[in-house]
Amino acid sequence: MTASIGKTNLLGLTQPEMEKFFDSIGEKRFRAGQVMKWIHHFGVDDFDAMTNVGKALREKLKAVAEIRGPEVVSEDISSDGTRKWVVRVASGSCVETVYIPQGKRGTLCVSSQAGCALDCSFCSTGKQGFNSNLTAAEVIGQVWIANKSFGSVPATVDRAITNVVMMGMGEPLLNFDNVIAAMHLMMDDLGYGISKRRVTLSTSGVVPMIDELAKHIDVSLALSLHAPNDALRNQLVPINKKYPLKMLLESCQRYMSALGEKRVLTIEYTLLKDVNDKLEHAVEMIELLKDVPCKINLIPFNPFPHSGYERPSNNAIRRFQDQLHHAGFNVTVRTTRGEDIDAACGQLVGQVLDRTRRSERYIAVRELSADADMPQSAATRT
């Protein structure tokens, strides 16, 4: 949908922002709740469809505001029920959103940026450079689009989307304000009413923003670890050179402590053949995380062209898992979903208009991890 010049896009406004908007046009604040319900509960993008809003106000809204989500380029459905949407954002780039059904739970994986500046060596999103931050409307718009696609009207009844993970393209903490606003809308009863424990933000480790996070929102936290020591993580996740593991894990523990509840950090660990999948790496990981309340998601690498990495054997994956399991950690191995529509872990596709490497376009890849309440193995740490 093309932007209308000078009009306010209501899709990305939080409740306080929506109330300020209605103040600014001389209307009462209760109108904010009315309009938000139409937008998020019923997926409406036409003011004339808002039957409990008077005609005069509808005409005023049409003159000064719009409800505009990202443009849906394509929607694919896998044989296992996984869905993938390619959406075009205002920068001209396309990003992807993936829905993973599992029993009564449905998890939506949402992107926060077009491209990424972190340049993780096993992720081709980083190879294409950073293009743009998504607006709050473009972030929450992915939930809005998916919800409408499922016909979940109102959004809070018999919902298809029970969990949202900020694990798509980009580093969410480098688009802090827009991601925070979108997550508030995910949890707001006037938005999508999703429990705070079912909204997960995944980060590669932007320490100052992890410390800032607890001041603004209470959601589950996942850490893209991928290596058990600084030397290896410096190679795989270059931001580690700025924020090494000790500093990073301390910031994660500060975040969890600040929430004042017993929380568990989700650790994401992509297994790369002969790189970080040896038993010695598992032993290092046990030592590194021994004092961190956490659960561990092991993600076997899904190769993409020219990645330079391979998926470990099933035996290697099982040995690594068993080593952690025997040390008392909750450990799961990610099951490949949506492979036939390129929606599996490490297969997300997005055409990004690259401002930092204009001569190349790459298939965008960002690991897709489980939602915050993914069932765990029987082992429990004491």
UniProtKB/Swiss-Prot annotation:
Annotated binding of S-adenosyl-L-methionine, by residue: 170-171, 202, 224-226, 302
Manner of cofactor binding, per the entry note: Binds 1 [4Fe-4S] cluster. The cluster is coordinated with 3 cysteines and an exchangeable S-adenosyl-L-methionine.
InterPro entries from the UniProt entry: Aldolase_TIM, Methyltransferase_A, RlmN_N, RNA_MTrfase_RlmN, rRNA_lsu_MTrfase_RlmN/Cfr, rSAM
SUPFAM superfamilies: Radical SAM enzymes
Residues bound to [4Fe-4S] cluster: 116, 120, 123
GO BP: rRNA base methylation; tRNA methylation
Catalytic activity: adenosine(2503) in 23S rRNA + 2 reduced [2Fe-2S]-[ferredoxin] + 2 S-adenosyl-L-methionine = 2-methyladenosine(2503) in 23S rRNA + 5'-deoxyadenosine + L-methionine + 2 oxidized [2Fe-2S]-[ferredoxin] + S-adenosyl-L-homocysteine; adenosine(37) in tRNA + 2 reduced [2Fe-2S]-[ferredoxin] + 2 S-adenosyl-L-methionine = 2-methyladenosine(37) in tRNA + 5'-deoxyadenosine + L-methionine + 2 oxidized [2Fe-2S]-[ferredoxin] + S-adenosyl-L-homocysteine
A single MF term (Gene Ontology): tRNA (adenine(37)-C2)-methyltransferase activity
Active site: 96, 345
Subcellular location: Cytoplasm
Disulfide bonds: 109-345
Alphabetized UniProt keyword annotations: 4Fe-4S, Cytoplasm, Disulfide bond, Iron, Iron-sulfur, Metal-binding, Methyltransferase, rRNA processing, S-adenosyl-L-methionine, Transferase, tRNA processing
Entry-linked Pfam families: Radical_SAM, RlmN_N
Domain of life: Bacteria
Radical SAM core domain boundaries: 102-342
Chief location bin: cytoplasm
EC number: 2.1.1.192
Cofactor: [4Fe-4S] cluster
CC terms in the record's Gene Ontology section: cytoplasm
Note: Reaction proceeds by a ping-pong mechanism involving intermediate methylation of a conserved cysteine residue.
HAMAP family registered for this protein in UniProt: RNA_methyltr_RlmN (MF_01849)
Family: Belongs to the radical SAM superfamily. RlmN family.
Record's function text: Specifically methylates position 2 of adenine 2503 in 23S rRNA and position 2 of adenine 37 in tRNAs. m2A2503 modification seems to play a crucial role in the proofreading step occurring at the peptidyl transferase center and thus would serve to optimize ribosomal fidelity.
Protein name (record): Dual-specificity RNA methyltransferase RlmN
The gene coding this protein: rlmN
